[in-house]
A protein has these predicted regions:
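Glycine-rich, proline-tolerant flexible connector loops at the mouths of alpha/beta enzymes
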Residues: 37-58, 115-121
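Catalytic domains of carbohydrate-active enzymes, especially glycoside hydrolases
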Residues: 20-41, 107
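Acidic/histidine-rich catalytic cores of soluble enzymes
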Residues: 35-36, 136-246
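Hydrophobic faces of well-ordered beta-strands that scaffold small-molecule active sites
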Residues: 3-7, 36-38, 68-73, 111-113, ...
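Boundary/entry segment of secreted carbohydrate-active catalytic domains
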Residues: 1-20
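Short, acidic/polar
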Residues: 15-28, 90-100, 192-200, 249-252
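Active-site beta-loop-alpha junctions enriched in small/polar residues
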Residues: 8-10, 39-41, 73-76, 116-118, ...
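Active-site acidic/histidine proton-transfer and metal-coordination neighborhood
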Residues: 59-67, 79-182
Length: 291
């Protein structure tokens, strides 16, 4: 098992010019991280496997002695209103195939992509059932393409619609490919009003990659600045330093250890705290859970 950091966790420092991707790698190494998950949104976008930055980033990671663990990108197989659904899905699948080639150029064996986004009011179970088969076909095609590179693709439990552990489990089982799994974020289940301990227990058997995130969970009916609603809108959430929130991370870690999972674990921090200090505290707290 290797514990490291998603570059997304350092987005604010990167956007403010305090870090770039190369100093982020050095920072992750300096706080005891063993890998960096590549999140292009935080470090720029990549449109070609021949982008010279890829080799530069690979060399920087190798020189620092940390792995590049996963390539994490956005996607949405569902069309916008008025858009042709079949044509949109075809274009999105082809775009993701190009991103698979970029992941392969980075030398990673894991790639997470989103599958579907809808506003909260359109994320009912009936709507999920209506969208499921459409999304399954797209995920299967991307996974089949990734197989030639030895890459496992995955869906993360986020974005409200394909977020609860049952929905994620059904998607993975229906795609029915050995190289399509889930990037399991232990904190994100709260967004779907789900207990993280129960959800981790449900999804650990299909996890190829794990995010450790923590949340403050409140039952307030009013959503103040900095918080966001759960799917039911009955609770509100705010990201925080891993180990400082309300997710039962200790029990989640116990389930993960008992499962025999021996892959990568990424700190994914998205709270208001200063990100560099927050990430350092987070990685120390998660290491203690797995000591």
């Amino acid at each position: 098992m290797k514990i490291g950091v998603s570059s997304y966790s350092l987005s604010r420092a990167i956007n403010d010019g305090e870090l770039d991707v190369f100093s982020a790698i050095e920072f992750i190494k300096s706080i005891g991280g063993e890998h960096m998950e590549i999140c292009p949104g935080a470090i720029g976008t990549f449109e070609s496997p021949d982008d010279p930055r890829i080799e530069q980033i690979k060399k920087a990671a190798a020189d620092a002695g940390i792995d590049l663990s996963s390539y994490t990108i956005g996607a949405n197989f569902l069309p916008a209103e008025g858009e042709d659904a079949v044509e949109h899905k075809k274009k999105e699948v082809e775009r993701l195939k190009k991103q698979v080639e970029i992941a392969a150029a980075f030398g990673v064996k894991f790639m997470r992509h989103d599958v579907a986004w809808r506003p909260i009011e359109q994320t009912s179970y009936d709507q999920f059932e209506e969208d499921l088969a459409f999304v399954v076909d797209a995920c299967r095609e991307v996974a089949d393409y990734a197989a030639q590179f030895g890459i496992t693709t995955s869906v993360e439990n986020h974005g409200y619609h394909f977020q609860g552990s049952e929905r994620v489990y059904r998607l993975v089982k229906l795609v029915n490919r050995p190289n399509f799994r889930t990037t399991m974020d232990v904190g994100n289940f709260a967004c779907a009003d789900e207990d993280s301990v129960a959800a981790v227990n449900n999804n650990i058997s299909i996890a190829s990659f794990i995010h450790f995130k923590d949340m403050l969970i409140r039952k307030n009916s009013v959503c103040p600045a900095g918080f966001f609603p759960t799917r039911s809108r009955k609770k509100i959430l705010r990201g925080t330093i891993t180990g400082h929130g309300d997710i039962d991370l200790k029990t989640c870690a116990e389930i993960i250890k008992a499962s025999g999972y021996d892959g990568y674990i990424s700190i994914e921090f998205e709270g208001p705290e200063v990100c560099k200090g927050a990430v350092e505290t987070s990685i120390n707290n998660v290491k203690a859970l797995f000591a």
